[in-house]
Every structure is written in C-alpha cells, then in structure tokens.
Amino acid sequence: MATELATQNIVAVNGPPRMTYEEYLALPNEGRLIEWVNGEVIYNMPPLTIHQDIVGYLFRLLGNFVEFMNLGRLYVAPFEMKCRPGGSSREPDVLFVSTANLNRIGDKRLDGPADLIVEVVSDDSVGRDFDEKFIEYQECGVQEYWIVDPRPRRKRALFYQRGADGLFEAAKVENGVYRSKAIPAFWLKVAWLWEMPDAQLTFAEIAGFSDEVVRALKERKA
C-alpha cells in the first residue's frame, strides 16, 4: 500500500504548462504531486494539516477493513489513476480497487477507474472536486465518490453512488451513518470524519467484534 499522503492546492503561475502525456511521464520526480489534465500540467503544494489528518484517518480505517475482509487494495496519493486511454491523469486522495479489478493495477499506475474515490476539499480544490472530478469520475466508471469538505463553516461530507442509469446519485445518510456499496458491509459514522476516534476501535465496531474483544483492545491502548 502507498504510505504517503495527498496534496491538493494548485499553483498556477502564468497558467499551467502544456505538454503531452509522454512528456508529463518524463518529468523528474521531485517529491511533488503533479496531475495531467487536458494537456496541462498541474503542480500541487502541501495541503493543510486537517486535510492530511482526514486522509490519514480514512487510510487507517478503510485499510483495516479492506485488509481484514480481503476486499482489494487501498491507496493514497501519490498514486496515479488514468481512468481511460487519452484521459486525464489524476491522483485521488484515497482510492479503493476491489479484488475483481486488481488487474487494473500496473507497476506505475491504475489503468482504469477505481471502485471508490475520496477527495478531501481544500480552498483551491473546490471547483475540481465538486465539478471537474465529479463529471470525470462519473463518465469513466467510478462506482462511488465521496467528497469530504472540512473547511470552516462548510464542514460536510457528500456521498455518491452510481445508479442504474450510470450517473452518480446522492446516497442517503441515515441517523448519521453512511453505508458503502463499493466496499461491501462497510459503514461509517459521518461524525468520525471530524472527531477521528481511534481507527482500530472504530474498525472493531464496524466489523461487529464482541464487547470482550473491544474491551481487550481498549485495555491494550490504555
């Protein structure tokens, strides 16, 4: 699994540079996240702490569940996803690939859509996350898309699942709980995104571990 976390804030000085995808691939790896979109190269800067905290928390929580249930692979940026040939090169904050689609994972990138993508919004990524990527992920076959917006006075999480018509539909959150389709049996208390309780204990709750096991976990962490 990838261990480094995503960045989202775009720097555009005199407009993004233009180049072919092959030229983009040949760029030196200087530790910066770069996306290639419609022939433009987008350089990214380090995000805010809250962005990384949420990405890291989801990586631990989802990762525990996906590994325990043997459901597939989970990645965080920097990891390239090229949804379709000739399409944009994106580096989602978090992406999940199911066991059935592991053949899409190559040595350097994911060739094809992830089953689930999570983008955590920053001030500079609002248009990309809510508009550009929403349309792009919908058109290329992503099954589920979460948008987590931690900005002050805008704190919210939106969940979309692919409908029978192939379009994203807003998924229900009932009693503060969201249930995923792309990750079978996984559910999430939305408040956890902001509270970020211990990921192992929340995983134990999701997985339905007995009270005895949960108590043992708490004692080990005490």
Predicted regions, residues:
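Gly/Pro/Ser/Thr-rich low-complexity, intrinsically disordered segments predominantly at protein N-termini
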Residues: 1-222
